[in-house]
Amino acid sequence: MKVIQLLPELKIGGVERGTIDLSQHLSKLGHESAVISNGGSLVSLLDQHGAKHFNLPIAKKNLKALSQIKNLRNIYAEFQPDIVHVRSRFPAWINYYALRKLKGKKPIVVSTFHGLYSKPFYSKSMSYADEIIAISKTVQNYIHQNYTVDSKNLHLIYRGCDLEEFNINPLSDAWKDLWYKEFPQTKDKILLTLPGRITSWKGIEAFINLFDHLDTAKFHGIIPGPVAQNKMNYFASLEKLIKEKNLSDHLTFCGARSDIAEIYKVSDIVFNLSSKPEPFGRTIIEAAACGTHVM
């Protein structure tokens, strides 16, 4: 069986990590796996298990990206997928129009709702699928309330994590040496961690404010996660807040990391402080699988 997954980019993130995990599992079962995206740091992980990657500029919501409909159709004609799995709204629109004029046998379309999507019309593309996956009961209920979907085609499949990667095995001395060389300010401190991409609803301000009430001689906070180009102003405002509170020596932004499992293990507590309900907080189960306290 041939399966293609479609998403904007393969950078650090829960959706992206899930895409890699599924691709790896498909390959392990003997299926032919491929991913279409605008690339990113996780593409190399596809190579490790023999999956294909088709680079297509579908990350930005603009007319130029819509011009990729024909190119996507050509990829389908070449790869001949049995299943196309769409994981994001804009790529789902491109997929919808690409399949309309695809000659021959059309693939089964599966979509995964990874969030409580606003803009119902724009998000409607995710409902244009033969089978739909909701990653939690919250998301499942939201789909029923906002979209016209047949219940028999809507499947509740909770997200999980790879227990081969997220486990209680001890950290290697080599990794610890590299970590403390890069972040010496974290050594011999109670390490508090707020993982996730830099965005306003992740509770980063609350995490920063927490340090007003802590003995900073004992505690250090780290925030591992990528900063998108359109979030640079928000990121700058966070850095300003930290500076105003004289916390620059006690809070560290780590950027996008490929060693997040090790970061969970070196942490004393991993936080999830999202200011609105998360569809599914993947960082919580990942950290718990590593034996780290979660708050």
Regions found by a protein language model. Name each.
Residues 86-92, 113:
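Short His-centered aromatic/hydrophobic patch
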